[in-house]
Amino acid sequence: MAYGFYAPIGEYETESVTLPGGASVRVESPDNIGYGFWTHQAQGAVAWYPWEDKRMAVTTVLTHEIHSDKEDFDLTPGRNLTLNWGISQYLPLKKDNSLLLEVGPAGYDSWQVSDDEGSDATSDAHDQVHAVGGQLGVTHVPWNLVVNLHYFYEFAAKDRFQGQAFGISIAKKF
């Protein structure tokens, strides 16, 4: 089990826009790089190794996100549940197994599991998105260091953006 949070950092501004007919509404600025709210998350992970030598791993990570009130709006975004999954095949790059190549499919499924709340909540729709892709990485066993590259293609998005994602993960065990 793990706990994490996202702080509302990065530029986040709102602006007033006048609609045809004279009504004025507050909207998010189009050049924001922040979300304008805190997120707390609880996370649990499971790994299964089909062989004793652990040359393959089947992993899942379940994350539950709880969001705070959105800055400058009467809106609390609904909670999200995300399932990340992957299969990693480890291939030795050195005969002594000190350097391993990791390759395999990966993906995620994310669902909004509660309603947005507040007078600025404009839709009863719950967002969701699904993604499939792959991962490629290197593990340096003596240093307990892992570097992974990920690519995901999103599909079946509802009430949110859909696209492609690239990422890098660096992990070091101390």
Where are the language model's segments positioned?
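Outer membrane beta-barrel transmembrane domains
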Residues: 72-174
